[in-house]
Amino acid sequence: MLQTLERTNIFDARVLTAAHADALRALAGPDGLPLLPCLHPALEEGQIDGDYAGQDELQAAAALLPLYAEDPLPTSLRAAGYGADGQGAVLTPPILREDYTQLRHFLRLALRWATERYASYHVWAVLPLDLEHPEACDDLCAQYLSAGLTLRGMRPMAGADQMLIFSAHGLVQWRDPLRRCHLADPALPRVLERGYAAADFGWGKNGLELVLRPV
């Protein structure tokens, strides 16, 4: 479940450049980063963040794409009404080595860089809903929420039949929870559409339980 122990306390995150192309390809494989058609332009623009975690090989990477870009992910996000003005950025799902345990730190840093880089609180992150691997999906969602992200939406988008949409802008007020939902709950997309969000969670006998509150 949610990783609470760090096997290494070395955190060596940086903005990747063209000089890191081979290291990035070694991590990502032939398919590259999820939801990013071309690596080279993103490297040239300084849009990919990575963490070596004190190792010789790259351990984690994700792209921060401006919402005004014409790539499939920003375009799909704008069409869904998230960041329709084109301001801000969206973080692609990260690629991680199997034993990488610092995802929360990596997400926090990437989101802080996005806020500074694009001077906007319209910073989003997405995660494909993978119900074929529920435990892994629960763990990733818990990591995102633990990093300070808020689950705001769930809908079909480029790259996934259902995409979890997180905002780096937290809830202004904490109100009594409406209900608890699992990621596989068919009511979850409708509840989120009605103006509820999940910024915290618990664990039950069936896995991750999102705590939904009105925004």
Please report, for each region that a protein language model flagged, where it lies by residue.
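Conserved GNAT acetyl-CoA-binding A-motif
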Residues: G88-A89, T115-P134
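Charged/polar low-complexity intrinsically disordered segments, enriched in acidic residues
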Residues: R175-V191, Y196
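Conserved acetyl-CoA-binding loop-helix of GNAT-fold acetyltransferases
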Residues: P93-E116, D139
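C-terminal "cap" of GNAT-fold acetyltransferases
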Residues: M157-R180, G207-V215
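Conserved active-site alpha-helix within GNAT-family acetyltransferase domains
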Residues: L129-M154
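Short amphipathic alpha-helix that is part of the acyltransferase structural core
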Residues: M1-L43, G50, D176-H182
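Conserved acyl-donor/pantetheine-binding loop and adjacent beta-alpha core of acyl/acetyltransferases
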Residues: P37-P41, E45, G50, E57-E98, ...
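Active-site rim helix/loop that mediates acceptor-substrate recognition in acyltransferases
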Residues: R25-L58, A63, L67-A69, A187-E193, ...
